[in-house]
Structure formats: structure tokens, C-alpha cells
Swiss-Prot record:
This is UPF0178 protein RHOS4_24670. NCBIfam families: PRK00124.1. Signal peptide: none annotated. Transmembrane segments: none annotated. Belongs to the UPF0178 family. It comes from Cereibacter sphaeroides (strain ATCC 17023 / DSM 158 / JCM 6121 / CCUG 31486 / LMG 2827 / NBRC 12203 / NCIMB 8253 / ATH 2.4.1.).
Length: 162
């Protein structure tokens, strides 16, 4: 059975992900250290983890498997769940896979080095846009279909047994 995990702290697409999860009839876990509204649908569950570095990430990484989808911007978390067989969609609609996660990790590390070398650099990435939201919805829809197919294959086509 497919589950959808949301790295919910500062995630701009929680409502969109919830609509997709409900439409597909899959459980969705909003994982954060607090500060998000309680879910309105019984398929959606808020998971509150203790504060601390990477606590929410580890909760997700310990559970995500083949047939699941994870929404996160956290590249190290994405690498862990991709290695476990889950599909990853970033809030901007970019998908992370076995084929591109190594490059994403290298780019993340390079950018961290560049930021630390220039302490006067200010600003961040570009603002989240309507186009990003649209790309996310399209990518999540495709990932959900692919994950559900992978989940059926992994369980031998018998979801009643999962």
C-alpha cells in the first residue's frame, strides 16, 4: 500500500499534497516538530516529532519504502528514501531518483561550500511561484501512479495482504 510522507516544516504544498492523497485514497503523514494545523481528512495524519536536527527526516527515512512517495526539499533525506526505493518530489515539482540524486547531493555540498566562503552573500533562492505549484501537482500525480504500481508489484499484486 502506498503512503505519502510530507517533510512538513516550511513545506508550501501541504494542501495540494493532501488533495492528491485523498483523491488516490492513500494515507498521508505530515511530519513536523509542530506548528501545523490538524488535518481535516481521516487519511491524513499529523506526526509531531521532538525538536532537534533531522528528527523529522529520520522518522520519514525509517518508514519510507518501495511504493511510497516523499515530498521534501531536504537532499540528504531524499537520498536516504531513494535508496530505500521511495519516490521523491520536491515542492517545486523536481523529482529525485537514483539517476540524479548523486548530482543533487554534489550540488548541495558545492553550494554550501560557496555560501560558507562568502559570509556577506545574502538572499536565497527565488520565491515559490504558481508555476512551481503546477509543476509539483503534475509531478506528484505521476509519482503517485508510479508508486502505486510499484507497491502492487512489490506485494505480488495483492494489496489486501499488505
Amino acid at each position: 500500500m502506498t503512503d505519502l510522507y510530507i517533510d512538513a516544516d516550511a513545506c508550501p504544498v501541504k494542501a495540494e499534497a493532501e488533495r492528491v492523497a485523498v483523491r488516490h485514497g492513500v494515507r498521508m503523514f505530515l511530519v513536523s516538530n509542530g506548528g501545523i494545523r490538524p488535518p481535516a481528512h481521516p487519511l491524513v495524519e499529523s506526526i509531531f516529532v521532538p525538536e532537534g536536527p533531522d528528527v523529522a527526516d529520520m522518522w520519514i527515512a525509517d518508514r519510507a519504502r518501495t511504493g511510497d512517495v516523499v515530498v521534501t526539499s531536504d537532499i540528504p533525506l531524499a537520498a536516504k528514501v531513494v535508496a530505500a526505493g521511495a519516490l521523491v518530489v520536491k515542492p517545486n515539482g523536481e523529482t529525485l531518483t537514483q539517476a540524479n540524486i548523486g548530482n543533487a547531493l554534489a550540488t548541495r555540498d558545492l553550494m554550501a561550500d560557496l555560501r560558507s566562503a562568502d559570509p556577506f552573500r545574502q538572499g536565497g533562492g527565488r520565491p515559490f511561484s504558481k508555476a512551481d505549484r503546477s509543476r509539483f501537482l503534475d509531478a506528484l500525480e505521476r509519482a503517485m501512479r508510479k508508486a502505486q504500481e510499484a507497491g502492487r508489484s512489490a506485494s505480488g499484486g495483492n494489496e489486501a495482504g499488505s
